[in-house]
Amino acid sequence: MSEEIDRSNYSADNIQVLEGLEAVRKRPAMYIGDIGTKGLHHLVYEVVDNSIDEALAGHCDLISVWINEDNSITVRDNGRGIPTAIHTKEKRSALEVVMTVLHAGGKFDKDTYKVSGGLHGVGVSCVNALSGDLRATVYRDGKIWQQEYKIGKPQYDVKVIGDTTEHGTEVQFKPDTTIFEATVYNYDILAARMRELAFLNKGITVVLTDLRTTDDDGKNPSDTFHSERGLSEFCEYLDRNREKLIPDVIYFEGENDGIPVEVALTYNTSYTENIQAYVNNINTHEGGTHLSGFRRGLTNTLKKYAADSGMLAKEKIEIDGDDFREGLTAVVSVKVQEPQFEGQTKTKLGNREVTAPVSQGVSTMLSNYLEEHPAEAKIIVDKVILAARARHAARKAREMVQRKNVMSGSGLPGKLADCSEKDPALCEVYFVEGDSAGGTAKQGRDRHFQAIMPLRGKILNVEKAMIHKIFENEEIKNIYTALGVRIGTEEDSKALNLEKLRYHKVIIMCDADVDGSHIETLILTFFFRFMKELIELGYIYIATPPLYLVKKGQKSEYAWNDDQRDKYIQEMKGSGLESSVGIQRYKGLGEMNATQLWETTMDPEARTLRQVTIDNAAEADQIFSMLMGDEVPPRREFIEKNAKYAKIDV
């Protein structure tokens, strides 16, 4: 995939310097996305990307990542080691140049790395600038070299601290707490990315270990990610909770017009498509030219096969591209020397030269498979025909959703208690479980900017429903209407149209019990599958009602978890007995009166809202399919590990 380079040829003079570091600390979000959870974890990805580049060049097969007890991070690889010799132009060690100058590194020298990862491509120097402390250790040329930095500034010249027979680079850093709003690393977020990298770069091993905690046996949580079959295994992982339509993962790897292309795809019995597209290991959430090439290759090849085999002869309906992608799970990975990223979040590939190579690769792979597997080919085409029929039914149902908006005067559902403010940026709507809790919420809200929409019972599980059934569902029609969301734009008849979106905060408020969690998940599944843009824009939130009211005499406190409850019990009992303290466990929102609901859950000054974000699209997709699909054991295991109510009400 990348040119082989002798270890000796990766030298100080391969390091190219493009610009200085000053701006990073002033405007960190420009370089790493944000200064919250996403940016914090992005620092780790930048360092790991350096090691992945070494792996792509054929010089590294083991990357180890530790979350240390103090929330610092250590990344170690067995690559060639960053060069330490004096840089000809800079007149200082190449290691210091790489660590202190933005965009300095071998990845900008095409002879050193043919392709390199990293969305922002800012390299490890950016991590250095945003770290309170960083230590770089290089094992190279029989010596151990080291340099330490504070907020990006070297504390001493690069020095030799010992001899070694090993080779590689180790970077330990602690993010600067004066810059980052979030400072605690989430093991699961890092694990999802390390797993993804192992699938995308087959043959390498990535080990993640959390030194902050131990299990019952006294061992630190640790995962080893390694994949011999790469994207084929990735597809199987994404689909592991879905029922297979065909037994195989169809796989292609090759180089067309100098662009390495790797594709894996399979079909399941669900009604959703799940295509994960990557460029240089970056998940391009907004798609781009490689995704267009994939879709074109898939549609044209399947259409031709279906027509040539006579399977479409009796069908009176037109088949379109979407029909070929219902139930499809695919991973597309391309390596591009100079990627051009576009779109809102800079995750849309713009290189036009990528479309044809991907399209050709998919066509060749799929044509061969269909010819060699006629039974599976027939199953796929039969599903396509069913999808086309369902799409025609869904179009009529979608038109009914639109008509409901237009025909019903204000276009708002009768159950919606709207707010008086008309600026969507200042308005919020609560989707509340049940009419009785909805009544309490209506009494407790601030009518100026808070709207209440009660939902009756459990909404439809969209993961298992055919698309026309979804748009015929009354509660789902009401959600579209209440939000002012329409379907169809000038460019795309099925795209989400947010021009008349009425609220910039959509808050899901359910009971604090197992049923409430289930309803919350059903609503989130709907948003993830049909209104993902609202999640990506940061508009979806989950309310956090208290679990307990702890009371003694005139004194009362709300508790949101068991630790808080126990703390208040100890404070209130004083020298008395615990039984002297009254504890009310709130199982439903209806158990609180309007004032209590306002004070704890709806008052912007006092409430806690959890914003719903998608850190890893591939991981989110498989979690939703697992939670809302048919397989019970993985769902039970996930809930026991993650749900705060699992042990209370089961």
Where are these regions (language model features)?
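Conserved short strand/loop->alpha-helix "switch" segment adjacent to the catalytic nucleotide/phosphoryl-transfer site
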Residues: 26-45
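Short adenine-binding "F-helix/F-box" segment of the Bergerat
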Residues: 87-88, 95
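Short Gly/aromatic-enriched secondary-structure transition segments
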Residues: 88-89, 445
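C-terminal interaction appendages of subunits in large macromolecular complexes
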Residues: 389-408, 423-428, 439, 443-445, ...
